[in-house]
Amino acid sequence: MATFKFLVLPHQRKEDGTYNVKIRITQKGKSKYIKTSHNVSASDIIKKKDNGKEKIKIKNQAVIDLMEEMILGFKKKLTSAGVEAEHWDVDRIVEYLT
């Protein structure tokens, strides 16, 4: 079954200093990202360095709750597709969910 995670990509900072929150879907070792309508600012995130790479964690609980709710909706929709969805590739899953 596909896995879902919400995240912010450090290299995709907008000119106004905000970042778009994305949902990463992984299936059979391949990932795709779905853009959401939610953006976070510097006050909503924590930046860290991990092995020289910048990582961003969302700390705004309201955004976290919204993203978890969105992921739950995606999981429910994917489950409703039946067991055949387990054999879909990530492109087919994203197409189905969006």
Identify the meaning behind each predicted range.
Residues M1-K22:
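Short, charged/polar N-terminal "headpieces" of proteins
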Residues K14-T18, Q27-T98:
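N-terminal helical hairpins
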